[in-house]
Amino acid sequence: MWSLPPSRALSCAPLLLLFSFQFLVTYAWRFQEEEEWNDQKQIAVYLPPTLEFAVYTFNKQSKDWYAYKLVPVLASWKEQGYDKMTFSMNLQLGRTMCGKFEDDIDNCPFQESPELNNTCTCFFTIGIEPWRTRFDLWNKTCSGGHS
């Protein structure tokens, strides 16, 4: 059986500690990288229908006769720490020339009247259960326009 002399064994202890620490850091880094990749994949798949739900809900709750549609997504992110998959987003919505109950709102032009405020900015938090095709509006806060 092979063994190190006691003085050599003590000099190897810091080296072993360093290697085990490096292994833990590498594992944690790879785990975080994989988790971020999974988040990005979920965002790519589930954010578009969540945006559609947000705009649909805005139009449904709005007292305005005209439909609004998405101008740009100002910011969006996947929330952590909820039971359901949850997205928060800041959206800018523009007022269209179509009524909100018309069929083809996506192809409807925006109103461009300078005397009217035709855009509003809204913050939404929406929980989703994609396996059940269920969306729950948890927060909607809007400013400007006819919100």
UniProtKB/Swiss-Prot annotation:
Gene3D superfamilies linked to this entry: 3.10.450.10
Keyword terms: Disulfide bond, Glycoprotein, Protease inhibitor, Secreted, Signal, Thiol protease inhibitor
InterPro entries, A to Z: CST9-like, Cystatin_dom, Cystatin_sf
Keyword Signal appears in the UniProt entry: yes
GO biological process: antimicrobial humoral response
Glycosylation sites: 117, 139
Cystine pairings recorded for this chain: 98-108, 122-142
Domain of life: Eukaryota
Any one GO molecular function term: cysteine-type endopeptidase inhibitor activity
Record carries keyword Signal: yes
Signal peptide bounds: 1-28
Broad class of where this protein is predominantly found: secreted
Annotated GO CC locations: extracellular space
Subcellular location per the Swiss-Prot or TrEMBL entry: Secreted
Protein family: Belongs to the cystatin family.
Protein name as annotated: Putative cystatin-9-like protein CST9LP1
Organism for this UniProt entry: Homo sapiens (Human)
Source organism phylogeny: Eukaryota, Metazoa, Chordata, Craniata, Vertebrata
